[in-house]
């Protein structure tokens, strides 16, 4: 059994995890006792059976009503629309280890005393945005389920059957249900009708939430990565100022130091601290208790020429421990950027193939919806349902693309932030650091759909353009 760990992305995304557990996703970690885990396994299996049962009955109805082209198209759209949910439930169950790995990847992030406040601020911003995203998508999903239910009672469904011999059209009244489905009994009368309505409402609600909860999880990961990149950009300027204090020149080479500005080391009457123990790697020093007050952490160091280099003070006016703190700040930035890259890579591994399946299904659905849209001839239930399908389907794609596009923009803007700093006034270490940053950030971070496409607004624009073009062609041919 794996105990609940209130840390990292698990703690940040705990509301998302609870929603996924509540609505039947196979999330079998983060429990406090084995009994809850066992009961949840039974619940998930029963829930999946109920969802698959209704999905299968819809497929049978598709075959039964395949004689009429309009009915065939409408039933196919419904089946494809809910295919997302079945695919994502099964996808998570099969590839859950990749999702657990992504949740755990931020359990032990590196930290630095100089940038703790900035890190906490951007973490709080990310947390607020992730909660807001979950609330908005959850509210929209509930509204869609209610609208779907209400729309059902505005029109009594019928089915037209054309007699091939007499060419007469026979109209058959169908049960007033949320979705057209085959049942081996009469589902249009009495208590049976009520029970089927309740079952179908449960089915629609759970299917919508199961699909969207996994989509929100994906977008929350990207949102968190974007805010971490914002954090790195924000600390770039103070990091450059710190890096500029380092220099590797030998003593008495004061001509290499530029004239300082008003920023300087705070002079004190206390004698310099004793030299620290020598170490082969200054980056690995324990930096705790180096400074005793806040001013020591916020001081801006200036190279000081002509001073006596003793007592552990180097040619740049920094003690060995101060130099170690500055170098550890550079190390913090690099390691945090590597950590973000690992997070984005893990997200792509966990969700990339699901994105491919989603886009393939969506492409077929939108193509059929474009055909359905050409048959809209007024304000009625048919028009409302067609428009609802289109808006909801495009909304799902847009949700992926807007966060994928932001990840690309934020990752490329890191290089711009590094280049715009006054790196040319710094030491050789500062210049080397900026060069490495620019080289590593030339290629933008992105999420791909199993290497077939990149999730961005360009993808959304191409899908939208293709659907509009196809719709206009159908209108011209009509």
Swiss-Prot record:
Q: Which residues cross the membrane?
A: 44-64, 74-94, 134-154, 191-211, 350-370, 383-403, 455-475
Against InterPro entries, the record matches this protein to:
7tm6_olfct_rcpt (IPR004117)
Q: Does the keyword Ion transport apply?
A: no
Q: How does it sit in the membrane?
A: Multi-pass membrane protein
- Any one Gene Ontology biological process term? response to pheromone
> Where does it reside?
Cell membrane
User: Where does the record place the region Disordered?
Assistant: 261-281
The residues that the database entry marks as glycosylated are: 167
So which stretches are on the Extracellular side? 65-73, 155-190, 371-382, 476-478
Tissue specificity, please? Present in antennae (at protein level).
* Gene Ontology MF, one: olfactory receptor activity
Write down any Gene Ontology CC term. plasma membrane
Cytoplasmic compartment segments: 1-43, 95-133, 212-349, 404-454
The record's statement on gene disruption is: Impaired behavior and fitness, probably due to loss of pheromone sensing. Ants also display gross neuroanatomical defects in the antennal lobe, with a dramatic decrease in the number of antennal lobe glomeruli.
Q: Which UniProt keywords apply?
A: Behavior, Cell membrane, Glycoprotein, Membrane, Olfaction, Receptor, Sensory transduction, Transducer, Transmembrane, Transmembrane helix
Quote the Pfam families the UniProt record gives: 7tm_6
- The answer to whether UniProt assigns keyword Transmembrane to this entry is yes
Family as reported in the entry's similarity comment = Belongs to the insect chemoreceptor superfamily. Heteromeric odorant receptor channel (TC 1.A.69) family. Orco subfamily.
Known function: Odorant coreceptor which complexes with conventional odorant receptors (ORs) to form odorant-sensing units, providing sensitive and prolonged odorant signaling and calcium permeability. Obligate coreceptor of all odorant receptors. Orco is a universal and integral part of the functional odorant receptor, involved in the dendritic localization of other olfactory receptors. Can form functional ion channels in the absence of an odor-binding odorant receptor. Plays a central role in the perception of olfactory stimuli in ants and is essential for ant social organization.
**What is the protein's quaternary organization?**
Heterodimer with conventional odorant receptors (ORs).
Give the miscellaneous note: In contrast to other ant species, C.biroi ants reproduce via parthenogenesis, enabling stable germline modifications from the clonal progeny of injected individuals without laboratory crosses.
Q: From the Swiss-Prot or TrEMBL record, give the protein name.
A: Odorant receptor coreceptor
| Organism (species) | Ooceraea biroi (Clonal raider ant)
């Amino acid at each position: 059994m794996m105990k609940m760990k209130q840390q990292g992305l698990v703690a940040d995304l705990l509301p998302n995890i609870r929603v996924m557990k509540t609505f039947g996703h196979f999330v079998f970690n983060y429990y406090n006792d084995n009994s809850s885990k066992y009961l949840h396994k039974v619940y998930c299996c029963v829930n999946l059976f109920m969802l698959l049962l209704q999905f299968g009955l819809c497929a049978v109805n598709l075959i039964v009503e395949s004689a009429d082209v309009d009915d065939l198209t409408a039933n196919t759209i419904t089946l494809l629309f809910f295919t997302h949910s079945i695919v994502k439930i099964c996808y998570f169950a099969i590839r859950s280890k990749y999702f657990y790995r992504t949740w755990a990847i931020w359990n032990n992030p590196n930290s630095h005393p100089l940038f703790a406040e900035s890190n906490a601020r951007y973490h709080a911003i990310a947390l607020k945005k992730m909660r807001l995203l979950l609330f908005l998508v959850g509210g929209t999903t509930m509204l869609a389920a209610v609208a779907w239910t209400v729309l059902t009672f505005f029109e009594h469904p019928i089915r037209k059957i054309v007699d091939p011999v007499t060419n007469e059209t026979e109209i058959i009244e169908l049960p007033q249900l949320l979705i057209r489905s085959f049942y081996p009994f009469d589902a249009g009368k009495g208590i049976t009708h009520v029970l089927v309505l309740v079952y179908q409402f449960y089915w629609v609600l759970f299917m919508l939430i199961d699909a969207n909860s996994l989509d929100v999880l994906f977008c929350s990961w990207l949102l968190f990565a974007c805010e971490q990149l914002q954090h790195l950009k924000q600390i770039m300027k103070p990091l450059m100022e710190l890096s500029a204090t380092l220099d590797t020149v030998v003593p008495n080479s004061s001509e290499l130091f530029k004239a300082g500005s008003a920023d300087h080391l705070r002079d004190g009457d206390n004698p310099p601290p004793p030299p620290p123990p020598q170490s082969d790697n200054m980056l690995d020093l324990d930096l705790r208790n180096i400074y005793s007050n806040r001013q020591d952490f916020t001081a801006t160091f200036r190279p000081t020429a002509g001073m006596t280099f003793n007592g552990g003070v180097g040619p740049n006016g920094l003690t060995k421990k101060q130099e170690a703190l500055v170098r550890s700040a550079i190390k913090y930035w690099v390691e945090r950027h590597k950590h973000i890259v690992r997070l984005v890579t893990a997200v792509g591994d966990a969700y990339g193939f699901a994105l491919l399946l989603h886009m393939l299904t969506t492409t077929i659905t939108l193509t059929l919806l474009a055909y359905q849209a050409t048959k809209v001839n007024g304000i009625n239930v048919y028009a409302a349902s067609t428009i609802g399908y289109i808006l909801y389907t495009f909304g799902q794609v847009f949700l992926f693309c807007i966060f994928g596009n932001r990840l690309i923009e934020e990752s490329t803007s890191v290089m711009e932030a590094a280049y715009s700093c006054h790196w040319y006034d710094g030491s050789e270490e500062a210049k080397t650091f900026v060069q490495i940053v620019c080289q590593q950030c030339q290629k933008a971070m992105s999420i791909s759909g199993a290497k077939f496409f990149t999730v961005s607004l360009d993808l959304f624009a191409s899908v939208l353009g293709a659907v509009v073009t196809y719709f206009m062609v159908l209108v011209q041919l009509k």
